[in-house]
Curated annotation (Swiss-Prot):
Bilayer topology term: Multi-pass membrane protein
Domain of life per record: Bacteria
Transmembrane segments: 31-53, 60-79, 84-106, 113-135, 165-187, 196-218, 228-247, 252-274, 309-331, 351-370, 374-396, 403-425
Keywords per UniProt: Cell membrane, Membrane, Transmembrane, Transmembrane helix
Protein name: Uncharacterized protein BH0208
Main location: membrane
An example Gene Ontology CC term for this record: plasma membrane
Subcellular location as annotated: Cell membrane
C-alpha cells in the first residue's frame, strides 16, 4: 500500500506542537465521558494519601489532583506528544515507603518537592545530552529487575495492610480486575460483545462493580450534593507550592537521589514501551505520520513536573510519559481507521478533556470520592502484578533471579538506597562486571505482555 502520510496540522512553537480541541482535533463525546470518569477515579486515588502525608484538607488535595489533570492533557494539546499521558505508577509504592520515614506535614512535603526536583533534573539533563539510553543501559538487568520487584512487593504489602478496612469491597474489586485482565480461562471464552466490552473497560467495570458491592455490604456510603466545587487555589499555593515551601535542603535532595534515579529508569522504560506502541500504530495507518521524538518527550515530562510544583504542589504521583492501558485502548481504535479516530492526537485529547470540568461537579465528586480507596487498591494491585511478571521476565539465570528478589525485598522494606547498594555489591560478587545483554529481550517481553491486554492502570 502506498504511503502518503503527513503530520497532523498544529501550531509549532520551539520543539513543541500545539493542537487544540475543535480546531485541530475532532471531538468525540462518548470517548470524553468514559475517559473523564476513569481519569478522575484513578488520578484521584492518591487524594487520601495526599491528605494523610501532607496533612491538608480534601479541598486542597482535590485541587492538586485537578491541576495534575491539566498538566496531563497539556502533553498532547500544548506540547504535541501522541502518548496518552499518565504517571510513573511503578514508583508509587517506593514513594510511599520513603514517605513513611518522614513526619507527615512539612517534612513530607519537602521530601516530595525534593523528589520532583531530582526527577526534573534527570529528565532535563538526559534529554538535552541524549544520554538516556546509555544511562538506562548502565544499570545491569538484575539490578533493574530487583528494583521493579521491590515496587511489586511494596505495592502488595500496602494492599494486604489495607484489606481489613473494607474486605468485601476490595476482594471483589481484586477478583474482577484480575479475572478481566489476566485470566487465561476468561481469555479463551468466545469473543462475544459483552466479553470484549468488559475486557476493554476492565477498570471501569471493576470500579462500578466494587462500588455496588461495597454499597450493598455497607462498606461504602455515597453522599450526593448539588453544586460546584470551587478550588481553593490560594490556600493550595500557600500550602504546597514551591513558592511557599521553598527549596528543599541538600540533605533531603541527597536522600531522595536513589529514588529519583529509580523513577527515571521506570520513566525511560515507559518511553521505550510507548515508542514501540506508537511505531506499531504508525505502520498500521498510511494517512498520518506520527512524530516520535524522545528528546522532546524528556522535555515534556520535566516541564509537566515543574509546572505541577509551580502551579499547585507535589502529589504522590510523579508525572510520566504514558498511561499504558489507555494508550493500548486508543491505539486499537486508531488502527480501525480515520472514521473511528481522525488522528492519533485526538485520542488522548478526547479521553482526558472532560476530566477537569467533571471534577468540578459536586455530584460527580460525591460518586467517585468513596471509590478512591478502591481505585488506589486496584492501581497498586495491578502495579504489583505487572511489576512482578516484568521483573521475572527480565532475568534468565538462577543467580540473577536471586539477586533480583533480594534487591526487591530490601527496596520494599528498607528503601531504594539499601536495595541498590546491596544489589550493586551482590552483582559484583556473584556476576561481576560483565553485561547481561537482555535489553532487546526485555523491551520485547514488556511489549508482548502489554499488547495482550486491553487496559491497565495509570502509568
Amino acid at each position: 500500500m502506498a504511503r502518503n502520510a503527513k503530520e497532523h496540522p498544529s501550531i509549532k512553537w520551539g520543539p513543541f506542537h500545539a493542537r487544540f480541541p475543535g480546531v485541530h482535533l475532532r471531538l468525540q463525546p462518548s470517548l470524553m465521558i468514559q475517559g473523564a470518569f476513569m481519569l478522575l477515579a484513578t488520578c484521584g486515588a492518591v487524594t487520601p494519601l495526599v491528605m494523610q502525608y501532607f496533612q491538608v484538607s480534601f479541598e486542597v488535595a482535590w485541587t492538586v489532583s485537578l491541576i495534575m489533570l491539566f498538566w496531563v492533557i497539556a502533553q498532547t494539546i500544548l506540547f504535541g506528544d501522541a502518548y496518552a499521558a499518565g504517571a510513573i505508577t511503578a514508583a508509587l509504592p517506593l514513594t510511599i515507603v520513603f514517605l513513611n520515614t518522614l513526619t507527615p506535614g512539612a517534612e513530607a512535603v519537602e521530601g516530595m518537592v525534593a523528589l520532583f526536583l531530582v526527577v526534573i533534573a534527570l529528565f532535563l539533563f538526559l534529554g538535552v545530552t541524549k544520554l538516556g539510553a546509555a544511562f538506562n543501559h548502565f544499570f545491569p538487568t538484575a539490578i533493574k529487575a530487583g528494583v521493579i520487584m521491590g515496587a511489586a512487593i511494596a505495592a502488595l504489602q500496602s494492599e494486604i495492610e489495607r484489606l481489613p478496612t473494607m474486605p468485601i469491597t476490595l476482594i471483589s474489586a481484586w477478583v474482577i480486575i484480575m479475572l478481566l485482565m489476566f485470566s487465561i480461562p476468561f481469555a479463551k471464552l468466545p469473543d462475544t460483545k459483552a466479553k470484549v466490552m468488559a475486557g476493554s473497560n476492565a477498570l471501569l467495570v471493576s470500579f462500578i462493580a466494587a462500588g455496588l458491592i461495597g454499597w450493598l455490604s455497607g462498606e461504602l456510603t455515597f453522599t450526593i450534593e448539588w453544586g460546584f466545587f470551587i478550588p481553593p487555589i490560594g490556600e493550595t499555593l500557600a500550602t504546597l507550592s514551591i513558592w511557599a515551601v521553598g527549596l528543599p535542603s541538600w540533605e533531603m535532595i541527597l536522600t531522595v537521589l536513589p529514588i529519583g534515579i529509580i523513577i527515571y529508569v521506570f520513566g525511560f522504560s515507559d518511553l521505550l514501551v510507548a515508542n514501540t506502541l506508537l511505531k506499531g500504530a504508525d505502520e498500521a495507518r498510511t494517512d498520518e505520520n506520527i512524530n516520535i521524538d524522545p528528546t522532546r518527550s524528556h522535555y515534556i515530562v520535566a516541564i509537566r513536573n515543574l509546572g505541577q510544583l509551580m502551579t499547585a504542589g507535589p502529589l504522590l504521583w510523579v508525572h510520566g510519559p504514558i498511561w499504558t492501558g489507555v494508550q493500548i485502548f486508543l491505539i486499537d481504535r486508531y488502527k480501525k481507521g480515520r472514521a473511528v479516530m481522525d488522528s492519533i492526537y485526538s485520542g488522548p485529547m478526547n479521553f482526558y478533556l472532560l476530566a477537569i470540568p467533571f471534577g468540578l461537579l459536586m455530584p460527580v465528586i460525591g460518586i467517585i470520592t468513596p471509590l478512591f480507596p478502591v481505585a488506589l487498591s486496584i492501581s497498586l494491585l495491578l502495579t504489583a502484578f505487572a511489576c512482578a511478571y516484568i521483573s521475572m521476565s527480565m532475568v534468565n539465570t538462577n543467580v540473577s533471579r536471586g539477586i533480583a528478589l533480594t534487591i526487591g525485598f530490601l527496596t520494599a522494606t528498607l528503601g531504594p538506597a539499601w536495595g541498590m547498594g546491596v544489589g550493586i555489591v551482590l552483582h559484583l560478587m556473584l556476576i561481576g562486571l560483565k553485561k547481561e545483554e537482555l535489553t532487546e529481550k526485555e523491551v520485547e517481553g514488556i511489549k508482548d505482555d502489554l499488547l495482550s491486554r486491553k487496559t491497565e492502570h495509570v502509568g
